[in-house]
């Protein structure tokens, strides 16, 4: 059996909500893929003036993405730097904490449960793209190739950069760790250079966590929001492979028009976006992945 269904599963799971300064919608669709391996988080007003959203695109199985979806916010809230409002350090440490938890006996047991009782070794991993809004500041932490794009002055302001093995710095680290890059893949296998999970690439005891073939360490971008910032678009790579960033923002803006922004409207727009991106067939290769998108609208901007 190949990676694709004979017909796409266009059923969507959509959630929307509203907080003090944010209206959001999240929608996910399995699409052409045999399985759904995406996960995401969305919490408005986790604390006063603080909201958090995230996309986790699984590979090699759904289990790591679902594990991170379950534990990320809980671990972030426990983090001392989070309590001290040192959000960049808190996000960085929480990304790394996910790998630590996966290595514990409890973590391994939970992975088996997510897999439906299959106790064979898991080779799964996931990307992580997490947006934290605090007052008028946005932090985006990224490991992998899920993305966040800010609609600023009606143009795209990219909040993350893909981590691909062909990137010079990433490739240099992979080679220092004893690996190689072939056809844009680490050791000819994984087409990401940073991810959560993928523990078989992180087992060299002589190397630190940020020196392994694959690392969970995120890049973090911080920006002060202003009156020209309208919304943040987040998504797994399947959302970004068909249209460029500017065209994606244009699609959303046209759908929003001059209507009053409500959670229900954003939910419909998110679903329309996925319907627009899915391929009519699998011949081209793009538009055939699982798709998850979040649209986070900034009130008063």
UniProtKB/Swiss-Prot annotation:
The way this protein sits in the membrane is described as: Peripheral membrane protein
Give the Gene Ontology MF terms in alphabetical order.
metal ion binding; protein serine/threonine phosphatase activity
Keyword Protein biosynthesis applies: no
| Chief subcellular location | membrane
Q: Which reaction does it catalyse?
A: O-phospho-L-seryl-[protein] + H2O = L-seryl-[protein] + phosphate; O-phospho-L-threonyl-[protein] + H2O = L-threonyl-[protein] + phosphate
Q: Name one GO cellular component term.
A: membrane
Compositional bias ranges of the Polar residues kind: 1-18
- Give GO BP annotations, semicolon-separated: signal transduction
Q: How is the cofactor bound?
A: Binds 2 magnesium or manganese ions per subunit.
Can you give the residue ranges of the PPM-type phosphatase domain?
A: 23-298
Compartment(s) of residence: Membrane
Which family is this protein grouped under?
Answer: Belongs to the PP2C family.
Q: What is this protein called?
A: Probable protein phosphatase 2C 4
Q: Which organism is it from?
A: Paramecium tetraurelia
